Amino acid sequence: MQPTISSMVGYTIRATDGDLGKVDQFYFDDEAWTIRYVVVKTGNWLSGRKVLISPVAFGTPESASGTLSVKLTRAKVAGSPDIDTQRPIYRQQEVELHAHYQWPWRGGYGGTFGAIPLPLSVDEASSEHESSGPERRDDPHLHATREVIGYHIHATDGKIGHVEDLIVDDENWAIRFI
C-alpha cells in the first residue's frame, strides 16, 4: 500500500499495551527520501508530550481503522529522551533516542538501516562530537513533512506546481512520489 502523509496524520499509534497518541507529522531524510521518524502527540497520558518513533518499530498502517501499530510499550515510550519537535533535531538527540530504544541507525550520512553503526555509548558519541571541531549540530537533511507540503516547485523555464502531499511505501517507508 502507498498511503499519503496527509492521510496518516491523525492515525492512532498503538503500542503493544495500549494507545500512545496520534500522528502529528513525519520527519524525512531528503537524501535517502525515507521517513526517519513519526511525531506522536501523546495526549493526556504523557502530559501532551510529543515523542519520536522510528519506522524500525512500525507495523503496517491500517487505513480502515486509522491505526499504526508499533512494537513498543507505553513505559518504553514514556522513558524516551525528551526532544523538542518544534526545534531542529540534533545528531546527539538522535543518538540518545536510538540508544534508548536500541534501534539500528537509520538515515543521514548513509540513508539506510545499518549504514552507520550506533556508537558504543552515548558518552563516546559526545566526546567524538566535541573533538571534531565546529560543525552543524542539526541534520540539514532531516525535514518535517509539514514544512515541505505547499512548497512551490520551479523548473529552469518556470513554475511547475507545488507539493500537495508525499506518497510513501509502507513496507520500507520510502517516499515514492510528491
What do the predicted segments below correspond to?
Residues 1-178:
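Peripheral interaction segments used for macromolecular assembly
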